[in-house]
């Protein structure tokens, strides 16, 4: 039996192999597209937030709002920088693999990619969650703690931060999808190990 549960015989071995290669290639192309999207979206998010500055004059005193004033935004910029760099490296790996016609990897490499994708996905989720909570306080305030609505004073700053968080959210969703693909790839390695001990990813 093959690892798809199909009976192996001289008549269907070549057909099933060709079909699996086709599926693998489609998965890798999808992975490449997602990694490129994550790289672009994460980079856009980091740039939008890192370059966001607004100066207001209050009682003859200039007050400047910048992303470093909120630690959650600093975290989001760092996380998106990591996600963009990591996605770029992995996208290059995907391109090289597709150009060489190799879509299968060794188990250690597959596990390394899996753990890397999981780590970056969790970082993205944590960064977006922290930034969204801080943005909510800035937008709505907290009367019980006497926290004022910062966005009433720094509208442009808040709007640009919102755009950055939205871009980071889409990058986060893309990273979660990529981590699912890498998880599928890793666990599929062991699906055929019993019936095809000589095959390697």
Curated annotation (Swiss-Prot):
Entry-linked InterPro entries: CASP/CASPL, CASP_dom
First and last residue of the signal peptide: none
Pfam family, one: CASP_dom
Cytoplasmic side: 1-28, 93-108, 188-201
GO CC entries: plasma membrane
Extracellular-side positions: 50-71, 130-166
Assigned keywords, A-Z: Cell membrane, Membrane, Transmembrane, Transmembrane helix
Similarity annotation: Belongs to the Casparian strip membrane proteins (CASP) family.
Quaternary structure note: Homodimer and heterodimers.
Protein name, per record: CASP-like protein 2B2
């Amino acid at each position: 039996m093959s690892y798809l549960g199909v009976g192996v015989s001289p008549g269907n071995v070549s057909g099933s192999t060709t079909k699996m290669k086709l599926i693998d290639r489609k998965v890798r192309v999808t992975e490449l597209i997602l990694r490129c999207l994550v790289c672009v979206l994460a980079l856009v998010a980091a740039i939008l937030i890192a370059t966001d500055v607004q100066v207001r004059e209050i009682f003859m005193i200039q007050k400047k709002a910048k992303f470093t004033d909120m630690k959650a935004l600093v975290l989001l910029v760092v996380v998106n920088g990591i996600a963009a760099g990591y996605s770029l490296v992995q996208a290059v790996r995907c391109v090289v693999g597709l150009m060489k016609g190799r879509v299968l990897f060794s188990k250690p490499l597959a596990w390394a990619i899996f753990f890397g994708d999981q780590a970056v996905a969790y970082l993205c989720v944590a960064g977006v969650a922290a930034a969204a909570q801080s943005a909510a306080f800035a937008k709505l305030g907290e009367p019980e703690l006497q926290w004022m609505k910062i966005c009433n004073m720094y509208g442009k700053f808040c709007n640009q931060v919102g755009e950055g968080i939205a871009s980071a959210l889409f990058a986060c969703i893309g990273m979660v999808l990529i981590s699912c693909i890498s998880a599928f790839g890793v666990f599929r390695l062991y699906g055929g190990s019993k019936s095809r001990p000589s095959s390697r990813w």
